Curated annotation (Swiss-Prot):
This is Protein TraE. Belongs to the TraE family. The lineage of its organism: Bacteria, Pseudomonadati, Pseudomonadota, Gammaproteobacteria, Enterobacterales. Keywords: Conjugation, Plasmid. Disulfide bonds: none annotated. Involved in F pilus assembly. InterPro entries: Pilus_assembly_TraE. The keyword DNA repair does not apply. Pfam families: TraE.
Amino acid sequence: MEHGARLSTSRVMAIAFIFMSVLIVLSLSVNVIQGVNNYRLQNEQRTAVTPMGFNVPFAVSQNSADASYLQQMALSFIALRLNVSSETVDASHQALLQYIRPGAQNQMKVILAEEAKRIKNDNVNSAFFQTSVRVWPQYGRVEIHGVLKTWIGDSKPFTDIKHYILILKRENGVTWLDNFGETDDEKK
């Protein structure tokens, strides 16, 4: 009888140990799954927004944005740099500099200061009218084609066809303008 009770106790203890081990493994796996889900909710949750003045909603997350958002930001950056006059150029360029990474601001400040100096000295007014926009959201690349009209003093406007490429990056909830370049389309 004593031998049977001891065997039964060992069997119950073994079953309890196996049951507790299974519970621990399940608990650990549920905690890992919860951790992954919490990370995704924190960093990849998209918020849909329809800004004032636009009729197209866009979605942004902590580290990414959709094509509509990138297009709207690129058009805003184009307006800040190209839709200027001798009175508004400083404020527009200062607003644009807020979206340039701090490490690259000095280089861009020099470029914008040269542009502002020419605009003020020659009493230039300019306006950019986009004709087409292409967006590659996976690369943060936006290509904008359009017509830049430039008035020097009281003269008739000069018209140039322009093609700009903007590279936008979204990191930790902040949108950065990594590149604002102009390309020359080859005449065919």
